[in-house]
């Protein structure tokens, strides 16, 4: 079998990994073997946390809406149920933003939902 010289290709592959590992601490950013492990782990964490971020933000919005609606004498679940009955189509992100930035408008939304 013919000899395969792949020094250039291997170097490019290793440099690609080392570029991804720039900024990592110690040998994790400079030695290929440890950098490769750290990069693979980092990419796994990034993939997982892109999905987790959606859940976390939804939980945050619900907590904010719940706190603001309780100040107006209504629990979160009752508020969401009455918003659906009143056919008010505000999503949780917008409701949380309204509760945080403009509490009087949020109180008006709660009053409309109650009636």
From Swiss-Prot:
Compartment list: Plastid, Organellar chromatophore
Origin: domain of life: Eukaryota
Keyword Ribonucleoprotein: yes
InterPro entries the UniProt entry points to: Ribosomal_bL20, RIBOSOMAL_L20_CS, Ribosomal_protein_bL20_C
Alphabetical GO biological process terms: translation
Any single Pfam family the record assigns to this protein: Ribosomal_L20
Gene Ontology MF: a single term: rRNA binding
Principal subcellular localisation of the protein: plastid
Record has Translocase as a keyword: no
Keywords: Organellar chromatophore, Plastid, Ribonucleoprotein, Ribosomal protein, RNA-binding, rRNA-binding
Gene Ontology CC: organellar chromatophore; plastid; ribonucleoprotein complex; ribosome
Chain's role: Binds directly to 23S ribosomal RNA and is necessary for the in vitro assembly process of the 50S ribosomal subunit. It is not involved in the protein synthesizing functions of that subunit.
Entry similarity comment: Belongs to the bacterial ribosomal protein bL20 family.
Cited PANTHER family: 39S RIBOSOMAL PROTEIN L20
Record protein name field: Large ribosomal subunit protein bL20c
Biological source species: Paulinella chromatophora
Gene: rpl20
């Amino acid at each position: 079998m013919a000899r395969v010289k792949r020094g250039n290709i291997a170097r490019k592959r290793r440099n690609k990994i080392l570029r991804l590992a720039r900024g990592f601490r110690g040998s994790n950013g400079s030695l290929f073997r440890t950098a490769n492990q750290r990069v693979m782990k980092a990419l796994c964490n990034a993939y997982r946390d892109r999905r987790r971020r959606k859940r976390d933000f939804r939980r945050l919005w619900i907590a904010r809406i719940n706190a603001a609606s309780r100040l107006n004498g209504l629990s979160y679940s009752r508020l969401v149920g009455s918003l659906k009955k009143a056919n008010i189509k505000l999503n949780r992100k917008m409701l949380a933003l309204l509760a945080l930035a403009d509490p009087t408008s949020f109180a008006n939304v709660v009053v409309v939902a109650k009636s």
